[in-house]
Design a protein with these regions (language model features):
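Conserved, mostly hydrophobic/aromatic
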Residues: 30, 37, 48, 94, ...
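Active-site-adjacent beta->alpha loops and helix N-cap segments on the catalytic face
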Residues: 2-9, 27-29, 53-67, 84-91, ...
Length: 252
């Protein structure tokens, strides 16, 4: 029995959450897309915010995210893959754009690597009415954020290098997920563990769920399905089965 399965039997499983990234969506029809995602039964919708500086791509401004709100009531989250300057100067706009229709906090994820004043950024997200969360790139050790774990609602483990969709999953990130889950349990923290990158309804989501993650960001792994509902249902089923101990093996 793996260490993660021992933790599962201890009753520490958190509800599975399926969070599609709209990066591979048809941007010209984003309103219809987020509405369809809501009807598919997703738990949140993620907007990958890129500034061409921290990562080599440009994506969504706060106005576009806010414009999508009138098409659905699903909670939003923004992953700020931006430089420290852009994060701090645009933070209030993104926190507000991510909120629910009635001002409910949206998840706002700051990258540890981009923010030398991470404590200040996370505190400001909370003060502005958001749900502060932190992301770690594949090369970044968990040790870097242990001192701010009591400030966050979510930790996002990148299982690809950020910047573009459709990249290959990095399986060695499973050890980082296990390390974070053990820390969360040891310190009795109310923190969800997210994974992002190469997440599909087979061994990748299965092994991440077994390692201790409960929130799964899927882009091409969900949009490749004939319908978004089929993608959502398959992802959720495989992750839930892994929490029960039915874990899929990596193909050889």
């Amino acid at each position: 029995m793996t260490e993660s399965n021992q933790l599962n039997l201890a009753g520490v499983n958190r509800p599975i959450q399926i969070i599609p990234s709209v990066l591979p969506a048809d941007w010209a029809n984003m309103g219809a897309c987020v509405k369809e995602l809501e009807e598919a039964g997703v738990d949140r919708i993620q907007f990958d915010v890129m500034d061409g500086n921290f990562v080599p791509n440009l994506t969504f401004g706060p106005e576009m995210i806010a414009a999508c709100r009138k098409y659905c009531n699903v909670p939003f989250e923004t992953q700020l893959m931006v430089s420290q300057y852009n994060c701090e100067t645009m933070l209030e706009s993104y926190v507000n754009a991510t909120k629910g229709a009635n001002g409910e906090p949206g998840v706002v994820i700051a990258h540890a690597e981009a923010n030398i004043h991470l404590h200040r950024v996370l505190g400001r997200i909370r003060d502005l009415g958001g749900s502060p969360s932190v992301a770690l790139n594949p090369h970044t050790p968990f040790e870097m954020i242990k001192n701010i774990m009591d400030m966050v609602d979510h930790v996002l483990v990148m299982t690809v290098n950020p910047g573009f969709g459709g990249q290959a999953y990095i399986p060695t990130m499973l050890n980082k997920i296990r390390e974070i889950r053990n820390f969360v349990i040891e310190k009795n923290l109310n923190v969800d563990i997210e994974v992002d990158g190469g997440i599909k309804a087979y061994w990748t989501i299965s092994q991440c769920a077994d390692a201790g993650a409960n929130c799964f960001i899927a882009g091409s792994g969900m949009f490749a399905y004939p319908t978004l509902k089929e993608g959502c249902d398959d992802l959720r089923k495989v992750a839930q089965e892994a929490q029960k101990g039915n874990v899929l093996s990596e193909p050889q």
